[in-house]
Every structure is written in C-alpha cells, then in structure tokens.
Amino acid sequence: MGQQKPQIRSTTVLGVLRDGKAALGSDGQMTLGNTVMKHSTRKIRSLYQGKFVTGFAGATADALTLLERFEAKLEAYSGRLDRAAVELAKDWRTDKYLRRLEAMLAVVSSDKALIISGTGDVIEPEDGIVAIGSGSMYALAAARALMKHTTLSAEEIVRESLQTAAEICIYTNDHIAIETL
C-alpha cells in the first residue's frame, strides 16, 4: 500500500443575488487531513475592475491558476461573463494540464451568479445562489431559507448562511470575508 496523499478541505464559498445587489463570501479555514493549518485564508477576490467577485474551493495553487486564466478570459472577452466562463470551462475540460486541476470557482456580478467546474460545467442557478466547497450544502440551505422567509440583504444572507455552515461543517470556520457589488 502506498501512502495516501492528504486531502485538502479548505472552504465554503457562498454568493447571493438580491434586489440588484450581489454578495460573495467565504470562511477562512484551511485544513490538511484532520489538521487546521490556517484560520484566515482569503478565498475571494474582485476581478475586472471590480465588476465581478469570485471565490474558489479546492487546492489553492490549482484555484489560483484558474483564477488567473479566468481573469485573462474576462479581459479577452471584454468583461462578458458568460462567454469568459464558457471559454474557461472548455479550456479546463480539454487542456491536458488544466483538467488535472482540482478546484471550483463561484462568480457573481450585480445580476448573475455562476459556478464553473472542472468537468466543463457552467451552472447558473435559477435562484441566484451559488455555493461551493465542503460546507456548501449547509450554506446553500440556509441561504435559500433566508431568501424565502426574510428581507435580509444579499450581504446579510451570505454572512448568516456562512455562520450556519461554520456551526455544522468541521471544515468551515467563522472567519468570514465578504465582498459586495
């Protein structure tokens, strides 16, 4: 038996669109195997002159490589989010080097929310909520409930939902970073 590579679980990223506003946030925990390595990792960033916010889940070096490629696609396609996302997904799926990268991206603009995966998927959820990472399903469930039953802002929904995920998922903490559009 060979030694198994420790699995890196590092994130919960959540994006919400509401009332013409967008917010995307993440927790700050990074774990390696069953050890917390860092509490305040920043996994979100603004792109294309502040018109988009993106977050990543997965292996950090892989995600940063994909973020660089995505930013280049946004530049190449004059900030057209759909086109840049599809072109990145095509490259990611077909390029021999890129398809080995283990990460996912969540992207929001003021009117659109997308998930971009390494399997070539570009997903635009109908409800304007995107969630990726180890605690994503907890954050997604909380965000959907808050969207239906409250008048909280996009930023407040992201904060409360990530807090809920942090209370449930051992790979998610409450060092929350949020960017809004």
UniProtKB/Swiss-Prot annotation:
Subcellular location: Cytoplasm
Main localization of the protein described in the UniProt heading: cytoplasm
InterPro entries reported in the protein's UniProt record: ATP-dep_Prtase_HsIV_su, Ntn_hydrolases_N, Proteasome_sua/b, Proteasome_suB-type
Keyword Hydrolase: yes
PROSITE patterns: PROTEASOME_BETA_2
Record function comment: Protease subunit of a proteasome-like degradation complex believed to be a general protein degrading machinery.
Classification via PANTHER family: ATP-DEPENDENT PROTEASE SUBUNIT HSLV, METALLOPROTEASE TLDD
Entry protein name: ATP-dependent protease subunit HslV
Taxonomic path: Bacteria, Pseudomonadati, Chlorobiota, Chlorobiia, Chlorobiales
Name of the gene encoding the protein in the UniProt record: hslV
